[in-house]
């Protein structure tokens, strides 16, 4: 059994007290929401870029000192992200200044996937949603209700041998999570269907439709590897199917 660290909590309280000399509780909470939302949306982002996004979307801007003071507080709290400098996660890197540290999703550190995603992000432009949309991603289970997502939901619901809305939603979330991964494939959808015991009636005749729906969902879902762009959007920008991570149903 673990017990709270009184000294650690005392330090946190002192840090918050100092920050509240400059920021209201409401403005501190807004920072928290941005940290959580961008963590889920981008999975890796520099504090410098996050700082820029926040100030671009709010008329009452933050000073860099206050922003970094809050970032330092989060390093001593429990979140689904960690903040590290490049020198702390990669070899032979110069020491990072606080503003150049990375906000990294916890799952990437847990499965040691951060290096691949960090590499893929380099040199790409960033898609930044409007403030109201971006902050919806504070909820790690938020799913943008795109036409492609709704079409996949309709397919799963229509072909379920027994209706179980909760299980179908779990299946859809698993599929949506998968389309954002490095090696996304429509065959993963079949694996999830079996795993979640949805008992979909997907015969040989319906399998091409599942492949098409999966590829359309993949190509129209905002992807952290593409810094928030969808594969379709990145393909339109570059004309490069491979670099855009575009999936063509004819390839399966």
Locations of regions flagged by a protein language model:
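Short acidic, hydrophobic short linear motifs in intrinsically disordered regions
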Residues: 44-55, 62-65
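Charged low-complexity interaction tracts in eukaryotic proteins
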Residues: 2-17, 22, 26, 68-135
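Positively charged, polyanion-binding regions of nucleic-acid-associated proteins
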Residues: 20-46, 154-157
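Extended alpha-helical interaction scaffolds used for oligomerization/partner binding
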Residues: 124-249
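Charge-enriched amphipathic alpha-helical scaffolds
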Residues: 57-95, 188-225
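Hydrophobic, Leu/Ile/Phe/Ala-enriched alpha-helical segments that form helix-helix packing faces
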Residues: 39, 54, 58, 71-75, ...
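Short, well-structured alpha-helical segments
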Residues: 32, 36, 51, 64-72
């Amino acid at each position: 059994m673990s017990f709270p660290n009184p000294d650690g909590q005392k330090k946190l309280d002192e840090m918050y007290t100092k920050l509240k000399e400059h920021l209201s509780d409401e403005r501190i909470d807004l920072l928290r929401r941005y940290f959580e939302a961008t963590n889920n949306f981008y999975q890796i982002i520099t504090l410098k870029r996050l700082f820029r996004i926040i100030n671009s979307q709010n008329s009452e801007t933050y000073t860099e000192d206050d922003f970094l003071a809050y970032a330092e507080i989060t390093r001593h709290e429990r979140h689904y992200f960690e903040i590290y400098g490049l020198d702390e996660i990669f070899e032979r890197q110069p020491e990072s200044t606080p503003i150049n540290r990375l906000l990294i999703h916890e799952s990437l550190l847990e499965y040691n996937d951060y290096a691949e995603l960090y590499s893929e992000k380099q040199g790409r432009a960033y898609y930044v949603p409007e403030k109201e949309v971006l902050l919806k991603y504070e909820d790690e289970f938020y799913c943008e209700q795109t036409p492609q997502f709704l079409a996949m939901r309709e397919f799963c619901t229509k072909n379920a041998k027994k209706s179980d809305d909760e299980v179908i939603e779990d299946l859809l979330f698993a599929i949506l999570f998968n389309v954002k991964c490095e090696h996304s494939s429509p065959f993963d959808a079949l694996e999830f269907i079996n795993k979640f015991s949805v008992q979909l009636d997907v015969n040989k005749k319906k399998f091409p439709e599942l492949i098409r729906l999966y590829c359309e969902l993949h190509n129209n879902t905002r992807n952290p590897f593409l810094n928030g762009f969808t594969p379709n959007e990145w393909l339109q920008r570059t004309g490069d199917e491979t670099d855009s991570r575009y999936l063509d149903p004819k390839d399966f």
